[in-house]
UniProtKB/Swiss-Prot annotation:
Function: Specifically methylates the pseudouridine at position 1915 (m3Psi1915) in 23S rRNA.
Organism expressing this protein natively: Porphyromonas gingivalis (strain ATCC BAA-308 / W83)
GO annotations of cellular component type: cytoplasm
Gene3D superfamilies: 3.40.1280.10
Protein name: Ribosomal RNA large subunit methyltransferase H
Chain sites annotated for binding S-adenosyl-L-methionine: 73, 105, 124-129
Length: 157
C-alpha cells in the first residue's frame, strides 16, 4: 500500500521539515510514503476564506483518484488511539487498498466539495496545532502504527 499525505502549503520551518523527513526515512522500511504539497493559494491573493477553501478544494480533488481511500485530517473527525490507528491501517492493507491519501487542508479547513467527496475523517486531537506540526505528528503516528503492526519495540502501552 502507498500512503500519500496531501497538504496545502509548504512548511517553512527547517526543524519541522527535518523531523518529518526523518520519519519518512524510517517509514521506507515498511510502506511507500510520500508528501504531496499543494501550493498555498493565499499568497498574494485577496480571496475570502470561502474562495480560498474552494480554490484549495479544487486542487485537492484534482489530485485524488477514484480508487483512492481518502481520509481528511479534521478536528471533527474520529479520534483513534495509536493502537486503534494501527488497526485501521492494517484493515486497509488487508482489504487490498493500493493508495491511501490523508489530506491536511488549509487554514480555513475544507471546501464543501471536498467534504462531500470524502467520507472518512480522523482527528489527531481536539486541540488546534499548526499545519506544519500536524505533518510531523501524523507522519510519526504512521511510523508508530507500522512498528506496532510489526511487533517492534517503539510503542509502549
Amino acid at each position: 500500500m502507498k500512503i500519500v499525505l496531501l497538504v496545502v502549503g509548504k512548511t517553512d520551518s527547517k526543524l519541522m521539515v527535518q523531523a518529518t523527513e526523518e520519519y519518512i526515512r524510517r517509514l521506507s522500511h515498511y510502506v511507500s510514503f510520500e508528501v504531496e504539497v499543494i501550493p498555498d493559494v493565499r499568497l498574494g491573493s485577496k480571496l475570502s476564506s470561502e474562495q480560498q477553501k474552494d480554490a484549495e478544494g479544487r486542487e485537492i480533488l484534482a489530485r485524488l483518484r477514484p480508487s483512492d481511500s481518502t481520509v481528511l485530517l479534521d478536528e471533527r473527525g474520529r479520534e483513534y488511539s495509536s493502537m486503534e490507528f494501527s488497526a485501521f491501517l492494517q484493515k486497509k492493507m488487508l482489504i487490498g487498498t493500493r493508495r491511501m491519501v490523508f489530506v491536511i487542508g488549509g487554514p480555513y479547513g475544507f471546501s464543501p466539495a471536498v467534504q462531500e467527496a470524502v467520507t472518512d475523517r480522523i482527528s489527531l486531537s481536539r486541540m488546534t496545532f499548526s499545519h506544519q506540526m500536524i505533518r510531523l505528528f501524523f507522519t510519526e503516528q504512521v511510523y508508530r502504527a507500522m512498528t506496532i503492526l510489526n511487533h517492534e519495540p517503539y510503542h509502549h502501552e
